[in-house]
Each structure stands twice: as structure tokens, then as C-alpha cells.
Swiss-Prot record:
Belongs to the peptidase T1A family. Disulfide bonds: none annotated. This is Proteasome subunit alpha. The formation of the proteasomal ATPase PAN-20S proteasome complex, via the docking of the C-termini of PAN into the intersubunit pockets in the alpha-rings, triggers opening of the gate for substrate entry. Interconversion between the open-gate and close-gate conformations leads to a dynamic regulation of the 20S proteasome proteolysis activity. The gene is psmA.
Length: 240
């Protein structure tokens, strides 16, 4: 995203709107999300799947140490695209909020409410001086009382429910694939394979999708949210 000299006076302060109604610092935060590794979520009647791509930015990088799918509570997980440090802060906040809710109310936090709490924090960082927006978008999904839920939170603090959503570098291509192939009545396995195929279409020539460069978390409407093992990921990748 490029801005001319006329815009420069408006992108220095987060609390000043430009004449066209933009907050340029928030727009810049969206650009950080677009540069992130491809991340997507799919929700059907039977399952919620969240997966995140892992890339080896350096030959010396231990890619196995990179975590892209996170457990927030027994019934809900998330992934993100954008600045990893910003994502880590919000994930820690979400985990603490989930734990406090359990301690106070003796029940799991609803996914809708947890997503709202995350988004409220993001929104606060768009209207105060001396801070900057979070340069990260989170995909949050899981199961509430047998009902599958999937949300995406934007750097602006807005959040929306989705049947399927993709963000990051390959977000456009993955979204196009999901729009053409999504069905609400897919089985658990079909939902997982749909998500993997959507990620596969984002790969550049010469790139391969292997169990070591993708993380997958899922929940069925009968069970809890959990992350797949390396062996489970390898088995599913053989089917696409």
C-alpha cells in the first residue's frame, strides 16, 4: 500500500482520520497481516479445522520449534497471520481470560465472548496516542455446546463469524478455492481435507506441503479442540 505526500500528515498519528475516513496506521497493520504465512479455518456442521503454514525463513531455523496453532481452552483454539510477537501477546491474553472465566463461573467461556474480548483489546489500540495497532489477525474456532464456531478478528478490532476464512500471503487463492468447494454437511475427514487442499493451492512452483510445514488443530461437535500429531498430518496429506 502506497500513500502520497498528502497522506503523510495523517499516518503519523493513530487517532487522526484522513479526509477519506481512513486510519492509516490501521491500514498498515492490515498490510502486516497480508505478509504473514497463510492461515485458514473451516467450519462445517461436524467439525472446525484451523491450520497454519510454517515456512523455513532460514536454513538454520528449527522449523519444528515454530507453533502456528494454539489451544486457548479445552474447546477452542486459534491461529494467526501477521506479527508473531503481537499474536503471542493476544494468545496469552485469551488463555488467561478463558482460565479466569472457568474459575469464576465454573464453566468454559463461550467462543463468541472470547473473540469479543480479544477484539476489544485490538480496538483499544486504535484510538489512543502512544500505541500502535496489533499487526495480526486471529482465526478463532471451536465448539460451544455441540455447535461449531469460527471467527476472524481484524487489526481494527472488528470480528465476524465465518464458515471458512483464509488470511496471510495465500489468503486470496485459498479463499477462492474455499468459495468454490465449501459444503456445510462435510464429514470431519472431508472438512480437514478441504482445508488442506485450500492451503495446497497457495503453494508456489517447487513448494511442497509436508507434515513438517503445516500445523492442524480441529474439534468435532462431540469432542474437544486438539492439535494433530506429525503422524496424523502425514496420513491426511497422503490423501490430497
Amino acid at each position: 500500500m502506497a500513500f502520497g505526500p498528502a497522506a503523510m500528515g495523517y499516518d503519523r498519528a493513530i487517532t487522526i482520520f484522513s479526509p477519506d475516513g481512513s486510519l492509516y496506521q490501521v491500514d498498515y497493520a492490515f498490510e502486516a497481516v497480508k505478509k504473514g504465512w497463510t492461515t485458514l479455518g473451516v467450519k462445517t456442521k461436524n467439525a472446525v479445522v484451523i491450520l497454519g503454514e510454517k515456512k523455513k525463513a532460514s536454513q538454520l531455523l528449527d522449523v519444528d520449534s515454530i507453533e502456528k496453532v494454539f489451544l486457548l481452552d479445552d474447546h477452542v483454539g486459534c491461529s494467526f497471520a501477521g506479527l508473531a510477537s503481537d499474536g503471542r501477546i493476544l494468545i496469552d491474553y485469551a488463555r488467561n481470560s478463558s482460565l479466569q472465566h472457568r474459575l469464576v463461573y465454573d464453566e468454559p467461556i463461550s467462543i463468541d465472548y472470547l473473540t469479543k474480548l480479544i477484539s476489544d483489546v485490538k480496538q483499544m489500540y486504535t484510538q489512543h496516542g502512544g500505541v500502535r495497532p496489533f499487526g495480526v489477525a486471529l482465526i478463532v474456532g471451536g465448539v460451544d455446546r455441540g455447535v461449531t464456531k469460527l471467527f476472524m478478528t481484524e487489526p481494527s478490532g472488528q470480528f465476524m463469524p465465518y464458515q471458512a476464512v483464509a488470511i496471510g500471503q495465500g489468503g486470496y487463492n485459498a479463499t477462492d478455492y474455499l468459495e468454490k468447494n465449501y459444503k456445510e454437511d462435510l464429514s470431519v475427514e472431508e472438512t480437514i481435507l478441504l482445508a488442506l487442499n485450500a492451503l495446497k493451492v497457495t503453494l508456489k512452483p517447487g513448494e511442497k506441503l509436508g507434515p513438517g510445514n503445516v500445523e492442524i488443530g480441529f474439534a468435532t461437535k462431540e469432542g474437544q479442540f486438539r492439535k494433530m500429531t506429525l503422524e496424523e498430518r502425514a496420513n491426511y496429506l497422503q490423501k490430497i
